[in-house]
Design a protein with these regions (language model features):
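N-terminal intrinsically disordered/low-complexity leader segments
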Residues: 1-33, 44, 103
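Amphipathic alpha-helical linker/stalk segments
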Residues: 26, 86-110, 142-150
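Generic hydrophobic, amphipathic alpha-helix propensity
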Residues: 34-42, 59, 84-88, 92, ...
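Helix-turn-helix
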Residues: 37, 45-79, 83
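Hydrophobic alpha-helical connector segments
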Residues: 83, 97-127, 152, 176-179
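Short secondary-structure transition hinges
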Residues: 119-157, 165, 188, 192
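Amphipathic alpha-helical packing segments from all-alpha helical-bundle domains
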Residues: 139-165, 170-177, 200-211
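Amphipathic C-terminal alpha-helical segment
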Residues: 161, 180-197, 211-212
Length: 212
């Protein structure tokens, strides 16, 4: 069953943003907050349909405004999808952070964070695909802390907690890339029907990345 999506959003998209929980079927629009309401409605719409079937006019209808009003904030559909993708990436990081903190020790936290990544993809497939299909000026993993979404910050933090203290930045980057490739590839295999949504199998695969 698809979980209700709590997402993190404001114009700056930093890790200090508040999590906003909005019912997926009826996001509410409050005067003066049209941009955030549009992102919420867009997230809800992606729970029901693919990115290809996403329509800006449907978002406007759901929040009770004209398409013209939305165009004042988003010049086209791609601009709105970009804002939704940014919110999704930060929310993914928040899910991973929560999983890591609940786990305790660094190695267990790494595994649980990876499981949370794959689980997010399975629970929100259209959003997950959008997040990583949206064009970016630079690779997400290379983005400065706080600008590429807290998902990448969380990944780098988890890697730093269990690699050797004297590891070079390049070594840590290679470890982070390897971990990301594993969980992202696993998520895509499940979404594309190439491997079953088997929680035990997913956990075993991710544990293989843990040293020792």
């Amino acid at each position: 069953m698809v979980q209700q999506l709590g997402y993190v959003y404001n114009d700056n998209m930093t890790s200090n943003d508040n999590i906003v929980n909005i019912a997926l079927d009826r996001p509410r629009y409050h005067h003066g907050d049209l941009r955030a309401a549009a992102v919420a409605a867009g997230l809800a719409l992606l729970e029901e349909r693919s990115v290809d079937d996403f329509a800006l006019r449907e978002v406007a209808r759901r929040i009770g405004v004209s398409a013209t009003a939305l165009y004042r904030h988003f010049p086209d559909k791609q601009a709105l999808l970009g804002a939704i993708a940014a919110a999704g990436l930060v929310t993914l990081g928040e899910r991973q952070r929560q999983a890591s903190e609940a786990a305790g020790d660094p190695l267990h936290a790494f595994v649980e964070s990876g499981i949370a990544y794959v689980r997010f993809a399975i629970d929100h497939p259209s959003l997950f695909r959008l997040v990583f299909a949206t064009a970016s000026a630079e690779p997400i993993l290379d983005s400065p802390r706080g600008t590429g979404g807290s998902a990448m910050d969380q990944l780098r933090d988890n890697i730093a907690r269990f690699v050797a203290d004297d590891s070079s930045n390049e070594a840590q980057k290679a470890a982070a890339l390897g971990a990301w490739a594993l969980v992202h590839g696993l998520a895509m295999l499940v979404l594309d029907g190439q491997t079953p949504d088997d929680p035990e199998l997913i956990a075993r695969v991710i544990r293989q990345m843990v040293p020792g």
